[in-house]
Design a protein with these regions (language model features):
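Base-recognition residues in the alpha-helical recognition helix of bacterial helix-turn-helix
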Residues: 33, 59-60
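N-terminal leader segment of winged-helix/HTH proteins
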Residues: 1-23, 67, 83, 89-95
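An amphipathic, aromatic/His-enriched active-site/gating alpha helix that lines ligand/cofactor pockets
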Residues: 98
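Extended rod-forming repeat segments used as scaffolds/tethers
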Residues: 32, 66-67
Length: 98
């Protein structure tokens, strides 16, 4: 048992905490699961799949983007999102060592 973590989180954990917090919502799980590997999807396409408002989808995308789970690129008037597989793999690999 790592009793020291009951008092203090490991160095660098703050970055990981945001990652795991972003994954703490079922809607965000569903958003991530609609992506095929290396696929880029625009906000309108994502919103069309769900029965919630576009502003709500945008909020969830922002949370995932701020946690580096998704990356985005603006093209004209559209914003395209893509799963940041490299970062997700890095976080999961590093947390195995705690």
């Amino acid at each position: 048992m790592f009793k020291q973590f009951a008092q203090h989180l490991p160095e660098g954990w703050d970055e990981f905490a945001g990652f795991f917090a972003a994954l703490g919502d079922p809607t965000r799980h569903k958003i991530l699961l609609i992506f095929e590997p290396e696929e880029e999807i625009c906000v309108n396409e994502i919103a069309a799949v769900f029965d919630i408002s576009r502003p709500a989808i945008s909020h969830h995308l922002k949370v995932l983007r701020n946690a580096n789970v998704l990356t985005c690129e603006k093209r004209g008037k559209e914003v395209y999102y893509k799963v940041n597989y490299d970062y997700c793999a890095k976080v999961l690999t590093l947390t195995q060592h705690f």
